[in-house]
Amino acid sequence: MKAFITVIGHDTVGVVARVSGLCCELNINIEDVTQSILQGMFAMIMLVDISKCSVSHEELHQKMDALAAEMGMQINLTRQEVFDAKIGRA
């Protein structure tokens, strides 16, 4: 199952390392990533495979929320199927 992780907040050292570290810890494979700094704001989108994630979807959201709070950033996890359903893909 594919999902998108988006990260937005003030640019600080270690953002990519911490988010990718959590992915590694939870057996989430990062398939693609893009990031940019926009006037001092960090923005990143990761396409990930969560099919072998070692925790439930609910616990994954909790862990992402906890990391976001620690870092003072916004982190969202959205399954690709949400977007596919909106455009009529199965």
Which role fits each region the language model picked out?
Residues 1-90:
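A conserved regulatory-domain signal marking ACT and ACT-like small-molecule sensing domains
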